[in-house]
From Swiss-Prot:
It comes from Mus musculus. Residues 178-191 have a biased composition (Polar residues). The gene is Ccdc54. Keywords: Coiled coil, Phosphoprotein. This is Coiled-coil domain-containing protein 54. The modification Phosphothreonine is found at T182. Residues 86-149 form a coiled coil. InterPro entries: Ccdc54. Gene3D superfamilies: 1.10.287.1490. Residues 178-214 are annotated as: Disordered.
């Protein structure tokens, strides 16, 4: 825009300058022609009288033409000065407009830079959000795979022949290790046990009744005690509860003279069973007889331990996982 205005101003100044210069040249040309004509006339008629008369007329014409020529030059200069002042004022206006437009362009550039910075920040935020979403998706898929794997692994362990063998081995190991810390006299155990514990045991068969009533049970050998313990363990049942959670904890309850509860993860069930299998199963040659009061004391401790474990398990299930029982064996 300002370039167009400068071009127009330059064109107008050039036109004014050429017009004034043309006028000056024309006036000078007229004077020169008059002088040349007068000189030629004086040479063609060389008389004194005419020369004097012509000299007077020439001097008068020159006196008349010089002020007019000077006046024309002066007017041309004034016009040129006015036009130059107009040009300068228009140029100053154009410069002001240029400055205004430049300020507007700078403001627009600043806004564009701010918008670009915001756009880059938003793109970075979007990329970080996408990365977070991808990581969350990966974690969710990992948790789902772990949950499915743990449940499948638990079911594989608990179901089928392998699970049954593990449960039977656990029963045998617990039955063989309990005479070290519990009473072995069937009469004292049954008489001192509470109704709940008695109800948890199945009723013994005829062979077991004979073995329990006979006084020779106190001096049994290893083979007879192991056989009786395995037979008794086969009739004792265990309750296994699986609680649905991401970690899939398992509660194992083994009933043998009291409630023993274990809380372990489904993925570590096999490790726990291997640890139990790796333990030594050495039995004492003669079972120990524990009095009635000692067994009552140990029974109270066992009840207190089971109450504490049950409270802990209830709080854990209340705040950490669901209370539904998926599988019960």
């Amino acid at each position: 825009m300002y370039r167009f205005h400068t071009k127009r101003v330059r064109a107008a100044a050039g036109q004014v300058w050429t017009a004034n210069l043309h006028k000056i040249r024309r006036s000078l040309k007229n004077v020169y022609q008059k002088c040349t004509t007068h000189h030629s006339y004086s040479t063609s008629y060389p008389t004194r009288a005419s020369y004097g008369c012509d000299g007077d007329t020439l001097s008068l014409n020159e006196d008349m033409n010089l002020p007019a020529m000077l006046q024309d030059i002066k007017t041309g200069q004034t016009e040129l000065l006015n036009q130059m002042t107009n040009i300068v004022s228009s140029i100053s206006n154009i410069q002001e407009k240029i400055n205004h437009y430049q300020n507007q362009m700078e403001a627009l550039e600043a806004r564009i830079n701010i918008s670009e910075d915001r756009q880059t920040a938003t793109t970075k935020d979007m990329l970080s959000m996408k990365e977070d979403i991808n990581t969350l998706k990966k974690k969710v898929t990992e948790l789902e795979s772990q949950n499915s794997y743990s449940s499948i692994h638990c079911l594989e362990v608990l179901e089928g022949q392998r699970g049954k063998e593990f449960v039977q081995l656990l029963h045998k190991l617990l039955q063989t290790e309990t005479p070290k810390g519990t009473a072995t006299s069937p009469d004292t155990v049954i008489s001192s046990a509470e109704p709940e514990r008695v109800s948890s045991y199945p009723e013994p068969t005829g062979e077991l009744k004979k073995k329990t009533t006979s006084p020779q049970n106190i001096t049994l050998k290893k083979n007879n005690s192991l056989q009786n313990a395995s037979v008794g363990c086969k009739k004792v049942r265990s309750n296994i509860y699986i609680y649905p959670d991401f970690s899939t904890w398992i509660k194992l309850t083994f009933v043998h003279g009291g409630n023993w509860r274990f809380f372990l993860s489904a993925t570590k069930l096999e490790e726990f069973i291997q640890w139990l299998l790796s333990r030594s199963t050495i039995l004492p040659e003669e079972p120990q007889i524990i009095p009635q009061r000692d067994y009552a004391f140990t029974g109270a401790i066992g009840r207190l331990a089971t109450i504490c474990l049950s409270l802990f398990h209830y709080v854990y299930c209340l705040f950490g996982s669901s209370k539904e029982e998926i599988t019960r064996l």
